Amino acid sequence: FPPWF
């Protein structure tokens, strides 16, 4: 998971 998700 990306940090913005």
Curated annotation (Swiss-Prot):
Residues recorded with modification Phenylalanine amide: 5
Tissue-by-tissue expression: Expressed by the skin glands.
GO BP terms, alphabetized: defense response
Alphabetical keyword list: Amidation, Amphibian defense peptide, Secreted
Cellular location(s): Secreted
Main location: secreted
Gene Ontology terms: cellular component: extracellular region
KW Secreted (keyword) present: yes
Keyword Secreted belongs to the record: yes
The family this protein is said to belong to: Belongs to the frog skin active peptide (FSAP) family. Tryptophillin subfamily.
Protein name: Tryptophyllin-T2-1
Source organism of this protein record: Pithecopus azureus (Orange-legged monkey tree frog)
Organism lineage: Eukaryota, Metazoa, Chordata, Craniata, Vertebrata
